[in-house]
């Protein structure tokens, strides 16, 4: 929603250019700022419904300058809130998860991201199942420096906030066109955004979008995948004021796309996943 109106992101010639990377990263900063402040188990915390309000998104979008980085993205004040209701989050999320994307021969689509958190979870075994260590997805700091309650603070019976983002994109006829998702802890959001922009805006097929260099920002520096040759366009961002940092960004994107009645699959080369069909 935040990046849709920007022409600098649209079309094949925009692929991985500095202006496009900057706009995407700035939108991600704003999104993470709101997510970290407001998102938690809705059974315990009233999540603001106005986070996706068009007028609110318009105001947030005005904070994005195509060729300039913001110093720090602050959470907004969505409609219905008189003040920023929750404190500064202190959650640390471990990268580890599994993604399955399916379209069957009748056109039914399924995207599932599953996790037990770290590799082998808590390392405890019960009747053939490994138990998770999902408590690490909570903030263990219940209040911030100002004494304001943190939305994602740990509590009995509460579900931890997750970054999992299994995604199904529907076409104009309501039929699934893209089914995707990824493991990767709190960076899952960056990987899914990269894949969707790559396919929808830059015209990449499912495999090329999955293999595309990972990048983005969670509110801090602009992260660029260190396991691939660093893009010069990323270094251009320093002139915009972005602090560019090479990082380990091990995605596991699995995508199925419907193109002209044909299904194409893309499996992230960074992990063991494969694309298969009958």
Per-range role (PLM):
Residues 2, 181-204:
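Alpha-helical support elements that line or immediately flank enzyme active sites
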Residues 262-278:
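Low-complexity, Gly/Ser/Thr/Pro-rich intrinsically disordered linker/tail segments
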Residues 117-119, 184-185, 220:
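A short acidic/small-residue loop/turn micro-motif
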Residues 5-115, 125-126, 243, 268:
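Internal maturation/activation junctions in enzymes
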Residues 103, 108-178, 202, 206:
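Active-site rim segments in enzyme catalytic domains, especially the processed small/beta chain
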Residues 77-87, 144-154, 238-240:
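Short Pro/Gly-enriched beta-strand edge/turn motifs at strand-loop
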Residues 21, 106, 157-160, 192, ...:
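Extended C-terminal subregions enriched in glycine
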